[in-house]
Amino acid sequence: MAQLTVQIVTPDGLVYDHHASYVSVRTLDGEMGILPRHENMIAVLAVDEVKVKRIDDKDHVNWIAVNGGVIEIANDMITIVADSAERARDIDISRAERAKLRAERAIEEAQDKHLIDQERRAKIALQRAINRINVGNRL
């Protein structure tokens, strides 16, 4: 049976390394499902969850919060390079919820003061916090 090898790497090191039968990601161009023998390609990832169906158990799915990055698919090897990534089991949801509140306050403050760059950064922080919360709740 054909399989994929999935590796997710951040500046801190290897976050994920397993075999899979299916991987789902969201690129800047939209959702993408990847099966073995997928065409080789490179794409830019959005801040979103990565879904990995493990080869060793058809009912076992791993969820990983990825904060953007790049995905390379080459000869059934999927490599994701991201600024940060966390497996669902490693996410501290209460910490992510606090980050969400901080980001929401920062957005309001930036809008009140018409600080466009700060507002943009705060919106990205909010998106990342929401992504972590969503993935953390997948367990």
Curated annotation (Swiss-Prot):
Disulfide bonds: none annotated. One of its GO terms (cellular component) is plasma membrane. SUPFAM superfamilies: Epsilon subunit of F1F0-ATP synthase N-terminal domain (SSF51344). GO terms for molecular function: ATP binding; proton-transporting ATP synthase activity, rotational mechanism. It is found in: Cell membrane. Keywords: ATP synthesis, Cell membrane, CF(1), Hydrogen ion transport, Ion transport, Membrane, Transport. Induction: Induced by a decrease in external pH from 7.5 to 5.7. Coiled coil: none annotated. It is a peripheral membrane protein. Transmembrane segments: none annotated. Belongs to the ATPase epsilon chain family. Produces ATP from ADP in the presence of a proton gradient across the membrane. F-type ATPases have 2 components, CF(1) - the catalytic core - and CF(0) - the membrane proton channel. CF(1) has five subunits: alpha(3), beta(3), gamma(1), delta(1), epsilon(1). CF(0) has three main subunits: a, b and c. NCBIfam families: ATP_synt_epsi, PRK00571.1-3. This is ATP synthase epsilon chain. The gene is atpC.
